[in-house]
A protein has these predicted regions:
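A short, internal acetyl-CoA/4′-phosphopantetheine-binding micro-motif in the GNAT/acyltransferase core
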Residues: 96-105, 132-137
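Conserved GNAT-fold acetyl-CoA-binding loop/helix
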Residues: 28-55
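Short, small-residue-biased leader/transition segments that mark boundaries at the very start
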Residues: 1-8
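A short beta-loop-alpha structural element at the N-terminal edge
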Residues: 15-27
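Acetyl-CoA-dependent GNAT
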Residues: 46-102, 113-114, 119, 123, ...
Length: 196
């Protein structure tokens, strides 16, 4: 169970914990690889550390921002943020996950994403969304691995935006995937902001 502040899973040497701003340099190092070498993010330029810390601060006002560590080294991170900045969307959250490019496909992503979903469910979030770059033909910048990862976790395709992202001289689709994790009621209680 990964619903507490610290989580140990069947991967005995890993820990999941809340991120802090002190983690920002390592988290940014992980993210920078994807900006510079992939279309997993549509961002062109690696943000400055100050800008990245500001993004983290904004997310942490309401949502969980988690890191996964192995032997004390951050190997990945995941967070949720507002799906759309309007009150009627409060029960929906967009999720983001990045693992160090050298440690993918070891089960860390699944454990980290499930820990994030557990925390969101405890907040009262009902709908999880993922915005994913998607290639018509896989290439050196983008595969379909992210879509397949989400599908294995129970996400389903909600929609496709065709040729909406341009990076490295090529056009890419963007897909939205969703997963419902709670009951939609006519008297829905408000979500509770995440507590650090």
């Amino acid at each position: 169970d990964c619903s507490s502040d610290v989580c140990s899973s069947d991967l005995s040497d890993i820990t999941i914990r809340n991120a802090t701003l002190a983690d920002a340099p390592r988290i940014l190092e992980i993210y920078a690889y994807y900006v510079e070498h992939t279309v997993i993010t549509f961002e062109y330029d690696v943000p400055s550390l100050a800008e990245f810390e500001g993004r983290m601060r904004d997310i942490m006002k309401k949502y969980p921002y988690l890191v996964i560590e192995r032997d004390g080294r951050i190997e990945g991170y995941a967070y949720a943020h507002a799906f759309v900045g309007r009150a009627a969307y409060d029960w929906a959250a967009e999720l983001t996950i990045y693992l160090d490019h050298d440690v993918r496909r070891g089960g860390l992503g699944r454990v980290l994403y499930e820990a994030l979903a557990d925390r969101l469910k405890a907040m009262g979030v009902l709908n999880l969304y993922a915005c994913i770059g998607y290639p018509l033909v896989e290439d050196e910048y983008l595969t379909r691995n992210s879509a397949q990862f989400h599908e294995h976790l129970g996400f389903t395709l909600a929609g496709t935006f065709h040729n909406c992202g341009y990076k490295f001289g090529r056009w890419y689709d963007m897909i939205w995937m969703e997963k419902i994790i709670g009951e939609h009621r006519p008297d829905q209680p408000d979500i509770v902001p995440y507590q650090y």
